[in-house]
Amino acid sequence: MSRMLPSMVPGVVRDAEGKARSDDVAYEFLAFKLGSETYALPLAGVQEILKPPRITRVPRASHEILGIVSVRGRVTTVIDLRRRLRVPEGPIDKNTRVLLVEAGNEVLGMLVDAVLQVYRLYEDEVELASAVGGDMNEYVMGIGRPRAVRTLGRSTSQDRSDPNDILILLHAEPLLRR
């Protein structure tokens, strides 16, 4: 399966006693909210998380493009991830963030409702998109079902995640295509 998750960065995995395990590979994802769903992108592609800066609208841009922003002198396009993924519109509030994401040679901003946390997932915690189905397969890598929240590389009984936690794992490159 690791060949099917090429954009992830393997990390050191530790067992319940904190000892490093080399037989498993963990992949890191940044989780965020869009509406009532939790989505995640490979952490390796996320360059920065920003409070929403002033966005300049671009005439005749596609509906999904909110506009452009200047980040340290670099002009960056910002897309509304809700529109791209056909999630109902929502307000921009104090939790809203812009993720600066690199895909290929381009960096684009993605507007999300809130950033949650970084998850480390084992290969057996990921169901590939072919098992998911639907019309969003181009964007969806798969589904993540974390067994436990891993804090500082360790998993403890107090860190158990909700068994109903489901992360919709996204491919960055198709999301950023214009």
Language-model segments: residues:
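An acidic, low-aromatic, low-complexity terminal/linker signal
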Residues: M1-R178
